[in-house]
């Protein structure tokens, strides 16, 4: 199996550079306050930010981004490793009530759907988990520690995943340019760049999660611009492209036609130098080809919302495919999201006096997602190289701001369909800690604490509606045992 790479950036161009080179990274945004990071570094050196060279600046920010994501993954791994309680595994397809003929008919429905028109996953029944309510499912119970020891994950890895942080800045006439953010700033900069030559610097920091070893380096290239008119600048700015990129231009987009020539690595201008990244991996003793996880010419799988354009509902354009993403044709006759399975966190809050469960965190799902508009728990596909518990902790932080260092895992429930499974991870806030959930991305309309008695009154995701009675009972048992 390939060594997973985590890109500490939401930059789609950086992600695309890696993908075209055979590496599909996991995207983890660092949320680094860049001006604050530069100010802090300058204070340590006893200088001002203006005194820092462009190389120093991009390296400071690349390291800050990689280290922030490394800390976040460390929190995930530590919380997962400290999990207590039992894992219950349910096998609904082995229940007597699920007859072979029913399964065969369901699989045939799946084949017919796959051969037909594009599926609107936000509404199609085939993307809805089957309702197994009223079915006596065979179950197996084991200590959760046994499950953790037997599953590959961050805590068991001897190498990787690798965490890559990058930052780019443009140097022109002795002045450092980051992202312009506004049309006025972009216009002023672009007019200066006409017919001029500048340098694009990109800092790189690579961390091996398993060992904690860190390597770093910077790439730079000279960019020779052609001459362009004020009208060219106005029309370019109108595309929106130059507003959120270092230097106010892109090599691979609309701005590429205005670049006459380049001296140096062109990938570094896009924001990630492949030769330098390969060299850094080598310093860690890792062969670059061991990171390959995409076949040559391999197309990306369907998105979570494939077919939604027919329903007039579009997922955000910035959403990108990540390792573990994809629809699975399940033995139950439905399609499920997550090639490695999926998982989520059912986080409960207890009364500080009685210890009883009072609230749980719930997610109001975005309209474009499967069963959009319903309520469930934050979670998603398990990425390559992580266990279901680690995946649930990562996804719930990314989606709902459930900070792993503030919760304790006390059990799990795995619904196993054979080729696919979903793991619900039960957790409580740690004593003295408070989780403040919020929607961190576009997969939710709302994330909030919901009173435990109000959960059945919400329009629930099919699987949650089926499972809620037993989940509520188990939360009560777990709260009593704490």
Swiss-Prot record:
Report a single Gene Ontology molecular function.
nucleoside triphosphate diphosphatase activity
Q: Provide the catalytic activity annotation.
A: a ribonucleoside 5'-triphosphate + H2O = a ribonucleoside 5'-phosphate + diphosphate + H(+); a 2'-deoxyribonucleoside 5'-triphosphate + H2O = a 2'-deoxyribonucleoside 5'-phosphate + diphosphate + H(+)
Q: Top EC class per UniProt?
A: hydrolase
Instruction: Say if the entry is tagged with keyword Nucleus.
Output: no
Sorted alphabetically, the Gene Ontology cellular component annotations on this record are: cytoplasm
User: Region Maf-like: what ranges?
Assistant: 1-299
Q: Which GO terms describe its biological process?
A: nucleotide metabolic process
Query: What does this protein do, in the record's words?
Result: Nucleoside triphosphate pyrophosphatase. May have a dual role in cell division arrest and in preventing the incorporation of modified nucleotides into cellular nucleic acids.
Task: Tell me what this protein is called.
Answer: Nucleoside triphosphate pyrophosphatase/Nudix hydrolase fusion protein
Taxonomic source organism:
Bifidobacterium longum (strain NCC 2705)
